[in-house]
């Protein structure tokens, strides 16, 4: 899948495994140099002090190597010697070598050398060495076969080492070694017996193959990249550990190492072959719901609990998609009984704490993050902003609440009330925020002159909208040179002087989540041909470039002809690193929109 001579390497995508905190990435500045880190703290590999250079040793000296990685293991080879690293979901990874050794050398990404190390020491029972790395946790090093050396060098009077190096070396008689490195916070986690290394590699591959079964087949021509996308999601999937009460899916492993609340529902949408897992994925953030207000929290990491703030009420949109594709039998009566109060409280939070003061359920946002579109031109006139794209999410959430109520044992009588509220809010949005060409956001009753793609996001309401609005939205989205580019829909009109392809998210670049939302919406509205065409443009480009979040459609700005701003890598922004968010958006389009 990834490697020195493969189509994609590990410069933009990091190598990881479901349920493992360890990742491996190739150094952008020193090509061919692999680096090992963990995502306990959520710190980016660009800045983390906890990064180890991985060096292949021949006769005890580092040599240049090539590498290949698949879900089973990552293998490095040079001059007849090879070393493989296999990750596990049991808080350790294994290293196996033949005619070569392996060195892990601590080197901060911020120029702090080995500062992350608080001490390296042999354990009294003789089982191995332990390293204390402060907020990054601990590592336990054990030679199963072969040998290893631990080297720490301190400057005179220094409290932290200048050098931390662990060398795993082959047995002199066999030329082989087998080792384990455990990754944990405070105390070594029980792991059982070490299995045969090749058995572990096959188990990893099987785990990935089983995970892939939750997805429908990709449309013809998209199968190869769909496998990469599935691997991306699988490798970002946590186990229940640290702050995570259940498995979550991280945005990225090496860059943005956090679980975002609305992204959990994005990840659920393409899981059409296992809707019960999709339902669990949608419900997972309700584990941390504020019982007093009903608010769902913001992002969280392994070591940091959910943050304040919030993201959009995306759960209704995700459920609406699942209901259209597979029905609602995956929600049992017991599920509905348990989740109705939680979903209802989430909907009421928006109406109570973000009410626009217009005498109804209309809401006004206080932050762009509440729409999901962090730098969107919808919000250029300030706040509070009545934003139809967020209102559309709330409408679908209300309908989902109604449906869950109907399936419950005790709340079925609430179904009609929620549907009435959803319908009234839909009509109010159409009456007040459709200007004949687009939906508009408003600040203090005045329309915001924005050319954001988000103006058309209410198409997610599908056939709840009048046909003339559906037709107009489809027309606007399929007119070349406005939002439609050769590679999909740009997040800001190409005619807008606010469009930028530099360090931006949704102010010009062609972004996966927006393209997915709009194509799913067009499909729901009966515009399958238009949805198919846009999705193919986006996914065809992903096939060529890899699973990054946003692409620059051109190298110049159409509104003035000037050279476009550039993103300078490496960085965690949408134009560089691979992410599960781009992967799940791609998977939704190639399994549920294209050719359907």
For the regions a language model picked out, list residue spans one by one:
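A structural signal for well-ordered alpha-helical segments within the folded catalytic domains
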Residues: 227, 265, 276-279, 283, ...
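Extended, well-ordered alpha-helical scaffold segments
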Residues: 200, 204, 221-228, 274-287, ...
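The feature captures the catalytic groove of carbohydrate-active enzymes
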Residues: 166-194, 253, 297-314, 328-331, ...
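Short alpha-helical segments and helix-capping/turn motifs at coil-helix boundaries
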Residues: 162-164, 253, 265-266
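Short glycine/serine- and small hydrophobic-enriched flexible loop segments
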Residues: 269-273, 317-327, 396-407, 460-463, ...
């Amino acid at each position: 899948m990834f490697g020195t001579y493969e189509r994609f390497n590990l410069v933009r995508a990091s190598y990881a495994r479901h349920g493992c905190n360890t990742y491996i990435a190739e150094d952008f500045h020193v090509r061919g140099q692999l680096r090992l880190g963990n995502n306990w703290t959520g710190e980016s590999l660009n800045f983390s002090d906890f990064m180890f250079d991985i060096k292949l040793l021949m006769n005890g000296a580092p040599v240049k190597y090539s590498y290949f990685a698949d879900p089973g293991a990552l293998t490095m080879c040079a001059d007849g010697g090879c070393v493989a690293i296999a990750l596990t979901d049991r808080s350790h990874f294994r290293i196996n070598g033949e005619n070569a050794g392996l060195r892990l050398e601590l080197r901060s990404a911020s120029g702090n050398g080995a500062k992350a190390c608080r001490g390296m020491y042999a354990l009294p029972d003789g089982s191995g060495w332990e390293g204390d790395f402060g907020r990054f946790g601990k590592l336990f090093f054990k030679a199963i076969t072969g040998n290893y050396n631990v080297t720490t060098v301190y400057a005179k009077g220094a409290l932290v080492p200048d050098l931390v190096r662990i060398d795993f070396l082959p047995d002199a008689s066999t030329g082989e070694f087998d080792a384990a490195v455990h990754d944990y916070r405070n105390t070594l986690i029980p792991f059982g017996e070490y299995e045969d290394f090749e058995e572990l590699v096959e188990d990893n591959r099987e785990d990935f193959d089983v995970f892939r079964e939750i997805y429908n087949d990709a449309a013809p021509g998209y199968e190869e990249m769909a496998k990469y996308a599935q691997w991306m999601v699988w490798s970002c999937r946590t186990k229940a550990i640290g702050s995570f009460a259940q498995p979550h899916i991280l945005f990225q492993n090496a860059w943005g190492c956090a679980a975002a609340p609305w992204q959990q529902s994005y990840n659920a949408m393409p899981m059409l072959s296992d809707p019960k897992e999709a339902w669990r994925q949608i419900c997972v953030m309700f584990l941390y719901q504020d019982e007093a207000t009903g608010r769902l929290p913001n992002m969280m990491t392994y070591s940091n609990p959910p943050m304040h703030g919030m993201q959009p009420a995306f759960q209704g949109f995700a459920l609406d998609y699942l209901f259209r594709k597979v029905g609602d039998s995956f929600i049992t009566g017991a599920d509905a009984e348990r989740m109705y109060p939680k979903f209802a409280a989430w909907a009421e939070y928006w109406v109570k704490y973000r009410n626009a003061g217009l005498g109804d359920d209309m809401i006004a946002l206080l932050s762009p993050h509440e729409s999901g579109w962090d730098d969107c031109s919808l919000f250029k006139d300030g706040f509070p902003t009545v934003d139809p794209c967020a209102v559309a999410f709330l409408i679908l959430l209300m309908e989902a609440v109604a449906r869950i109520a109907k399936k419950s044992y005790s709340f079925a009588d609430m179904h009609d009330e929620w549907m009435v509220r959803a319908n009234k809010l839909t009509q109010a949005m159409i009456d007040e925020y459709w200007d004949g060409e687009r939906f508009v956001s408003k600040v203090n009753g005045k329309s915001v002159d924005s050319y954001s793609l988000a103006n058309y996001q209410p198409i997610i309401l599908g056939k709840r909208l009048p046909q003339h609005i559906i037709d107009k939205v489809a027309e606007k989205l399929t007119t070349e040179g406005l939002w439609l580019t050769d590679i999909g829909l740009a997040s800001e009109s190409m005619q807008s002087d606010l469009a930028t392809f530099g360090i931006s998210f949704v102010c010009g670049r062609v972004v996966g989540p927006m393209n997915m939302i709009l194509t799913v919406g067009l499909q729901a509205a009966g515009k399958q041909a238009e949805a198919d065409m846009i999705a193919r443009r986006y996914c065809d480009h992903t096939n060529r470039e890899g699973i990054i979040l946003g692409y620059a459609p051109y190298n110049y700005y159409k509104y003035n002809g000037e050279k476009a701003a550039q993103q300078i890598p490496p960085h965690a922004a949408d134009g560089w690193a691979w992410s599960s968010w781009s992967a799940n958006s791609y998977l939704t389009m190639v399994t549920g929109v294209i050719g359907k």
